[in-house]
Amino acid sequence: DKDEKADLGNNPGENGQSDSLNLLVINKVEKTAQILQISRDSMIDIDIYDVTGNKLMTEDGQIALQYAYGDGEERSCQLTAGKVSELLYGVDVDSYLSLTLDGLVAATDAVGGITVTVPEDYTAIDPSFEKGATITLNGDLAEKYVRKRDIEVLDSNNQRMERQSQFMEALIEKMQGIDDKTEYLSLYQNLDEYMTTNLTAEELEELADYKISEDIVKVPGEIISKDGHAQYLVDNKELKKIVLNLFYKLL
């Protein structure tokens, strides 16, 4: 949720938050993949750490907050991945990739812009975001499209998640269209300063071989307001069905 990577050494709880959380579930046998979108406001037990990295306590909070108790880079990603695993009943999260907003701008410009059809009237964010309008987002406009929201509206994050899903599908499609390995590695190198990941360039390139479903699955639940903040209460019964369907196979 920051334009740049956090400065190491910041106080715990001040190293940014996860603005958008998505888990790519891959089937290595069938070479298919499915995106599971997780609301940043999903309530879970957040681990609180001191400046030396010692765990102090656990308290109820939005999953986006867990990132803030790391270092803004690898540690933040590891902590967040752990909470995603916890949310999904212990399913292993093997890899992570975090991209700053500056990186989003760079990625969008690198692929020549992203074309979307605006699903609702978002002219309050930008005059060009009229309902039904088909527009090509450049870097700065792309940031507005996936980041901006009216925090006074309780459901604004869910609305933003819809735009993020739409944008992500279009970006993945563009990146999968890159056939030249040299061009792909060049894109990876250009994004390196904005990105934190434990994946190699070669591993990321391999994802181009997977057919990614256009239907993004969302963690089910309902949004409520409490103490002036949005809270997304996960429907654990329905989530368990999704986890069983995505990660397990009947024998």
Feature annotation, model-predicted:
Residues 1-251:
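Non-catalytic, solvent-exposed segments at the cell envelope interface
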